[in-house]
Amino acid sequence: MKNCHIGRILSATNSIKNPRVLEWGIGGSTVELSKHAGEWIGLETSPKWAHSVALAARNATIICFDQGIPTDPEHIYQDELKKLPLNEYVDWPKANGVFDIIIVDGRKRARCMEVARSVLADGGTIFLHDAIRTYYWDACVGLNKIVHVDERGNELWEMSK
């Protein structure tokens, strides 16, 4: 995620006192942004990546949904992961309250968007990274949207109910 997009999420996070943040798909933005939240929960499918990010993002709670697929070589791991429904990963938030900020930047983004709608706090914001991918768009219908585009054309959609 580019700095301009991280800056937009940071601005939203800083506008709420002690926000509760949910992030599907962790990474460098988790490390940077989790310092600014009251509670930060990151959901991940790669145990190797979850461990690496957790070491750097001490303010975040990282929950890994290990699918039991060997992570090396990486391209085979990614191909196998695409075939799985990842229901626990997608549905985890349903039983865990509401969130002020939700970042969708991992696997199964369209399905995660559907869940995000149901667990978004009143006045909350959903961010969808790489929103230029048309197969995510149906999951965003009916939400208010602001589009942020970085210098490479990647889109971050900022949405609310």
Feature-to-residue mapping (PLM):
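SAM cofactor-binding core of SAM-dependent methyltransferases
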Residues: 2-74
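Exposed alpha-helical structural elements
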Residues: 8-11, 88, 139
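Generic enzyme active-site microenvironment
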Residues: 21, 42, 103, 127-128
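Generic detector of well-ordered alpha-helical packing
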Residues: 24, 45, 106, 130-131
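Short, surface-exposed linear patches
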Residues: 43-46, 64, 84-85, 124-128, ...
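Short, charged, surface-exposed secondary-structure boundary motifs
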Residues: 49-57, 71-75, 135-140, 154-160
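Internal catalytic-core helix/loop-beta-alpha segment
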Residues: 63-115
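C-terminal substrate-binding/active-site "lid" region of AdoMet-derived donor-dependent transferases
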Residues: 92-96, 101, 107-161
